[in-house]
């Protein structure tokens, strides 16, 4: 699916128009909307959609992460912006986007090569509603486990047609995805502080799109428990970009639970307001009694 000649000729005028201040245009979605307009002209037959994340756009089988592109364009002339945007789209989707339900065999990366880029993800159920062939499994009432192919400028959630092209079952994805995610998580910082006279809390925030999914990583969660100094902790992932954990004896536990709910409703990148208990045996939802102890 190649860009139309008319579209390519027209983008000099589109990108040369005076642009508003770009201080917050990535976070408020204006930059994404600019890219969507360009994409619709370049690939008029492609299915292009957005969600509540202003830093990404879905183009057929691809999910493009726009943060790096936005940073690269800062301070550039309009002519240079045009050149770099078109170069980014060509590099990210060589040959153009392909439909979700029929990835061309010539472009299907062998699984032996792709497995090094597998990552584990946590996504809301509406992702599966929007893309019915997405490979998922239940995690909690509000979250599904999914799998992604990671790249600097995009990630691609794994779909059933991709499994068919690779000749594998969905169960094959989990082990390498967890292993790769654990390896990356070793470099992720965890900040811990007291919560008044009793208890401690910890946070871990990243902008790589995988902070919430680290709930699924035993090695990372062991680091969080060590930072809090106790074998059993409460943890939540209200948005994609951070997790928060605290000791069960924290005098601020009810207040923290309110912060979790508020962050989930405020977003962006909302994931879940659920509270989980983490210990060496694994992760589980809080019991009714534990929820009541947190004002729930």
Functional labels for PLM-detected ranges:
Residues 63-65, 251-252, 291-293:
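Short, surface-exposed beta-strand-loop junctions and turns on beta-sheet-rich folds
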Residues 15-25:
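Bacterial Sec-dependent signal peptides at the C-terminal "C-region" and cleavage site
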Residues 38, 55-200:
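Charged, alpha-helical interface segments at or near domain boundaries
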Residues 284-296:
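Short, low-order "capping/linker" segments at domain edges
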Residues 24-50:
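N-terminal alpha-helical "arm" segments
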Residues 1-14:
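N-terminal secretory signal peptides and thylakoid transit peptides that target proteins
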Residues 50-55, 237-241:
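Short Gly/Ser/Thr- and Asp/Glu-enriched loop/turn motifs at secondary-structure junctions
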């Amino acid at each position: 699916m190649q860009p139309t000649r008319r579209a390519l000729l027209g983008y000099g005028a589109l990108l040369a128009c005076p642009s508003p201040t770009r201080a917050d245009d990535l976070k408020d979605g204006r930059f994404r909307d600019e890219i969507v307009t360009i994409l619709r002209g370049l690939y008029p037959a492609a299915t292009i959609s957005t969600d509540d994340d202003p830093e990404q756009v879905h183009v057929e089988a691809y999910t493009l992460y726009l943060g790096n592109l936005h940073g690269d364009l800062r301070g550039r002339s309009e002519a240079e912006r045009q050149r770099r945007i078109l170069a980014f789209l060509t590099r990210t989707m060589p040959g153009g986007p392909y439909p979700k339900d029929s990835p061309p065999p010539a472009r299907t990366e062998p699984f032996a090569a792709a497995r090094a880029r597998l990552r584990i993800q946590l996504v809301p159920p509406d992702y599966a509603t929007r893309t019915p062939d997405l490979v998922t499994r239940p995690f909690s009432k509000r979250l599904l486990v999914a799998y992604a192919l990671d790249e600097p400028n995009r990630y691609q959630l794994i779909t059933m047609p991709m499994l068919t092209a690779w000749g594998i079952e969905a169960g094959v994805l989990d082990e390498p995805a967890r292993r790769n995610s654990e390896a990356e998580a070793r470099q992720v910082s965890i900040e811990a502080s007291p919560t008044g006279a009793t208890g401690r809390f910890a946070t871990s925030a990243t902008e790589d799109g995988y902070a919430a999914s680290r709930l699924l990583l035993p090695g990372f969660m062991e680091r969080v428990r060590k930072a809090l100094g106790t074998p059993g902790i409460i943890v939540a992932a209200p948005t994609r970009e951070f997790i928060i954990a605290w000791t069960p004896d924290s005098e601020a536990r009810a207040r923290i639970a309110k912060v979790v709910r508020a962050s989930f409703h405020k977003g962006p990148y909302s994931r879940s307001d659920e509270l989980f208990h983490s210990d060496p045996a694994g992760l589980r939802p809080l019991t009714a009694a534990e929820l009541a102890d947190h004002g729930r």
